[in-house]
Amino acid sequence: MRTGSNSRQLELRPHECVEIFLISGSPEERGEYAEDVLKNQSARIILCSIQYVQHATETIDFIKREDFRTYIQWLNPGHNDVKTQYWDYLGLISRLMSIGATVSIRSGQGNPTGRVQELREFIYGWAVFRNLIVSC
């Protein structure tokens, strides 16, 4: 899916949806600042990737300023990486954890079904607790 200017419904379970806003591609890859992409958004759930580069700290600083609840799946190794895990040599994971992010490390190689289901379950639990689930 491509980034749009509107939120959309994500079906988490049959006939149970939640409103999300999707940023397709990380702000770092897109050459955009997360705050600019997210201005005027009212969705309570944002799906976004963060590129593992030094200037990703700008996105993390925005997350901290906005007091977002953050769940991270660090794809390590990434889809196109060699089959070796990398250390957090930029300190981004430590920085995210210091602002209360929940972090999991998953392989970006192979079948994504398990990690996608993990994301759906996390979003569902978070959304149910906040009464954000709607019929679809």
Q: Where on the chain are the PLM-derived regions?
A:
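Conserved nucleotide-sensing/catalytic segment adjacent to the nucleotide-binding pocket
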Residues: T3-R65
